[in-house]
Amino acid sequence: MSAAMMNKSVVLSKQCTKPAATPKVVTSKRSFASTVANKNREMMVWQPFNNKMFETFSFLPPLTDEQISKQVDYILANSWTPCLEFAASDQAYAGNENCIRMGPVASTYQDNRYWTMWKLPMFGCTDGSQVLSEIQACTNAFPDAYIRLVCFDANRQVQISGFLVHRPPSATDYRLPADRQV
């Protein structure tokens, strides 16, 4: 290596080892309470009793027909297949009594419980009103059952989403969003 090249590499290495400018640290005088999103000054405690949830959207108030129809439009826009399922109140939540177990091996379907399918999957469905009429028919047939809408992707052969569309009037395991915190 020539002397000129060595001098050049020494100069380059000195430039690379220069310390970076230290950023100025800014401290805030605000307390944690002033940064809470809901503008509350107190932390809330989640109500642990009678506050069960189901899949997607269960933290929201019950969906209206218009909101369900919009979700169906989204499902159809993604080429997924909507399907209705229902379950009695005592079979709706996961538990040892209603989980299907085959010896020490458990089924690979979600949480090892199956809901009953309402008719067949809606392969030919083109809009939300068709699903809403099926929800109404299922509700009329089983008024004291939980009903959920699930959607399947035929290409990936998986369930994509599922959400509750009907909660029985006799259900006592649910709280409105305003009552979920202590």
Swiss-Prot record:
Keyword RNA-binding: no
Gene3D superfamilies named among the record's database cross-references: Ribulose bisphosphate carboxylase, small subunit (3.30.190.10)
InterPro entries: RuBisCO_ssu, RuBisCO_ssu_dom, RuBisCO_ssu_sf
Transit peptide stretch: 1-41
Pfam family, one: RuBisCO_small
Cellular compartments per GO CC: chloroplast
Chief subcellular location: plastid
Keyword Plastid: yes
A GO term, aspect molecular function: ribulose-bisphosphate carboxylase activity
The entry's keywords: Calvin cycle, Carbon dioxide fixation, Chloroplast, Photorespiration, Photosynthesis, Plastid, Transit peptide
Subcellular location(s) per record: Plastid, Chloroplast
One Gene Ontology term from the biological process aspect of the record: reductive pentose-phosphate cycle
Family (UniProt): Belongs to the RuBisCO small chain family.
Comment field (misc): The basic functional RuBisCO is composed of a large chain homodimer in a 'head-to-tail' conformation. In form I RuBisCO this homodimer is arranged in a barrel-like tetramer with the small subunits forming a tetrameric 'cap' on each end of the 'barrel'.
PANTHER family referenced in this protein's UniProt entry, alphabetically: RIBULOSE BISPHOSPHATE CARBOXYLASE SMALL CHAIN 1, CHLOROPLASTIC, RIBULOSE BISPHOSPHATE CARBOXYLASE SMALL SUBUNIT, CHLOROPLASTIC 1
Role played: RuBisCO catalyzes two reactions: the carboxylation of D-ribulose 1,5-bisphosphate, the primary event in carbon dioxide fixation, as well as the oxidative fragmentation of the pentose substrate. Both reactions occur simultaneously and in competition at the same active site. Although the small subunit is not catalytic it is essential for maximal activity.
Assembly, per entry: Heterohexadecamer of 8 large and 8 small subunits.
Full protein name: Ribulose bisphosphate carboxylase small subunit, chloroplastic 4
Organism the protein comes from: Acetabularia acetabulum
Gene: RBCS4
